[in-house]
């Protein structure tokens, strides 16, 4: 049996050509063995009809096995030639034939250097993706922190607004300067709050771009 690797043919047929030839060989061999059993049984029946012939069953079996070895040797020689013809002319794919799944390589050929460059580019893109993912995660954490700060500042602003209203309703001359001071601080906190809101909007836009 041939041991020549036929990987492309195996890809096309779904089985190795050598396996196909082996199955054909075993099928012929089984048929030959079965035929010899039939021939032996026919000879034995013929001998039973000839009582004058002094030939034992053992001699018949020995002769049958000898003939079987002769036939098998001839069959192996013929099958070797048949296998060579089938593997070359029937079960082989010419060098100029491409399988459908391999035609893309013909349309877009590339060298080993180009393949290595492509692998390097893919590796760089993967690193960039990981870096952008880490940056996005950091921005999301910062955004959550800004939201928490904004919530606390809103509480402080509400407290100052309430205090200012109380001073307006129940204020006296003694609280005038305190009221002015509190009002100025309230405006400063409002400015800080607006600054925080603007930063939060910028962070959201940057996160959307990522």
From Swiss-Prot:
Signal peptide: none annotated. Residues 124-208 form a coiled coil. Keywords: Cell cycle, Cell division, Centromere, Chromosome, Chromosome partition, Coiled coil, Kinetochore, Mitosis. One of its GO terms (biological process) is cell division. It is found in: Chromosome, Centromere, Kinetochore. One of its GO terms (cellular component) is nucleus. Transmembrane segments: none annotated. Belongs to the mis12 family. Part of the MIS12 complex which is required for normal chromosome alignment and segregation and for kinetochore formation during mitosis. Essential for proper kinetochore microtubule attachments. This is Protein MIS12 homolog. It comes from Gallus gallus. The lineage of its organism: Eukaryota, Metazoa, Chordata, Craniata, Vertebrata.
